[in-house]
Amino acid sequence: MLTSFELVLIKGHKDTLAKSGKSYDTITLAEIAQMAEVPNRLCKLDAPALIASTYNAPDARSHAAQREHGCFHAFVLDVDEGNTSLKQLNQALSAICGDCARIVYATSSATADAPKWRAIIPFKSPVTGQEYEQLQQALFASLAAHNITCDQAMKGAAQMSFLPNVPPDKRGEDGAPKYYEY
């Protein structure tokens, strides 16, 4: 079951509210799950992204601010190397995390010959920004024991992670994704 807490939503890689005094919009895991079923059709850098924290103040994209104020509700990982299949990733996550809820989807740069994955795995209880970075490191080490390499940048408390998206150049003439799994 996907709970209803609201995570930081970033509208494209240039979206910054640091000097605006405004808070970032938010998104729920249920909304992300719906997006995984019908991914966005945007150029990668214009696509929405998330930070797995509920701290959405104007400085939410700062690692220091998220470490200090962040309340994190999910692991987020990127698997960009190693030709890992969706089945292999799900088996490894089940071995490590048990029968847990998760959203796993192909990234915007994935192809059938070079699959790449993003996974969002909710916690039972929220953790601080410092705890989040430590837990991310532990999960990545556990996945490495299953021969799955995670993008180490995702350990950062304010690291944004793109949401489900298949850009126009990765779609056929009919608009359907050339490759997308979730």
Regions found by a protein language model. Give the residues of each.
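Generic secondary-structure boundary/loop-capping signal
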Residues: 47, 52, 120, 151, ...
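Short, conserved secondary-structure transition motifs
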Residues: 110-112, 127, 149-180
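Secondary-structure boundary/capping signal
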Residues: 100-102, 147-150
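Generic structural signal for short, solvent-exposed loop/turn connectors between secondary structure elements
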Residues: 83-85, 171, 182
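Short linear, low-complexity motifs centered on an aromatic residue
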Residues: 134, 138, 176-182
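Contiguous ligand/interfacial binding patches
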Residues: 140, 144-148
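Signature for HUH/AEP ssDNA processing cores
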Residues: 1-115, 121-134, 138
